[in-house]
Each structure stands twice: as structure tokens, then as C-alpha cells.
């Protein structure tokens, strides 16, 4: 892996989200839904908390530790999914997972992913796919438990 490829993965937007993650809470709220997921490959741990009220995701936040990619992706995930309906959140999550696997997604879905669309670059770095998708899988797991 060349240095040019690494700079493609660790672009300015990713580094900004990792350095100052949005919706990061040292102490997660105890009400609502919570889940913790681990990525043993990289050592990432993500704790996600959210409330579902009237079919919408509210108070979406996270904490945890891990690599730059996992922390940046979790930050982007909270920006993207917060306030969305559960149906829209599921579509965005699936679109994000497809993007990270190198599968094509619609321009509309890519636009809906906001900053998170830059994470599509992890498709070229298979070892980083789990890092990028961990927080998204956490919310997906919570939503699937609600069905």
C-alpha cells in the first residue's frame, strides 16, 4: 500500500471527524437503546445509544475507542442517521454497507449519506471495512431488535 493510497483513506474530513467526533458522549444516557460492538481485528469498541420515538431516531450518540476510521465513521453515522425515520435509517445503513464493500449505490443514497460517503474508499482497504462499518452495524442491530 503506497503513501498516496493511505492519504486517500485518511483524508482531511476523516481526520477531522476522528479528532473531534460529533455526538461523542463520555457517559451515554441510560434510557433508550444501547449496544456495544467490538472489532477484534483492530481492537475497536463502539458503544451506541439512541431513542426511538414515533418511528424516528433521537438522541443518537456513541463512545468507545479504536482506530481513526472507526471513530470517524461513528461520528459521521450520528450526523447521518440522527433524526431519521427507522425506515430511512435502514436504507442509509444498507447503502453505507454496500458502499464500503465496493458495491454501487444510487446518487440519491450517496447524497443522503452526507460526509459518510467518503468512507467508500475503505472498499480498497479490506482490513479497514470492519472498522468503518462497526458503528453502522450497531444501529442496524438495534433497529433489527425492534422489529
Regions found by a protein language model. Give the residues of each.
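Structured beta-strand/loop patches that form or line metal/cofactor-binding pockets in enzymes
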Residues: 20-60, 64
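Secondary-structure capping and boundary motifs in well-ordered enzyme cores
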Residues: 42, 69, 124-127
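Alpha-helical support elements that line or immediately flank enzyme active sites
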Residues: 73-85
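Short, thiol/selenol-centered motifs that function as redox-active sites or metal-ligating centers
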Residues: 65-71
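C-terminal binding/interaction regions
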Residues: 1-24, 86-147
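A generic structural motif
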Residues: 64, 82-83, 135
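A generic structural signal for alpha-helix starts
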Residues: 68, 84-87
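Alpha-helical macromolecular-interaction surfaces
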Residues: 71-72, 91
Amino acid at each position: 500500500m503506497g503513501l498516496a493510497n493511505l492519504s486517500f483513506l485518511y483524508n482531511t474530513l476523516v481526520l477531522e471527524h476522528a479528532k473531534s467526533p460529533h455526538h461523542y458522549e463520555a457517559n451515554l444516557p441510560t434510557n433508550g437503546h444501547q449496544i456495544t460492538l467490538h472489532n477484534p481485528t483492530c481492537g475497536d469498541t463502539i458503544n451506541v445509544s439512541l431513542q426511538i420515538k414515533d418511528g424516528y431516531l433521537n438522541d443518537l450518540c456513541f463512545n468507545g475507542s479504536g482506530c481513526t476510521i472507526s471513530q470517524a465513521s461513528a461520528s459521521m453515522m450520528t450526523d447521518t442517521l440522527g433524526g431519521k425515520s427507522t425506515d430511512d435509517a435502514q436504507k442509509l445503513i444498507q447503502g453505507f454497507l454496500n458502499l464500503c464493500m465496493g458495491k454501487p449505490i444510487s446518487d440519491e443514497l450517496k447524497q443522503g449519506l452526507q460526509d459518510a460517503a467518503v468512507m467508500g474508499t475503505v472498499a480498497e482497504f479490506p482490513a479497514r471495512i470492519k472498522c468503518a462499518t462497526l458503528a453502522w452495524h450497531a444501529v442496524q442491530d438495534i433497529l433489527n431488535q425492534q422489529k
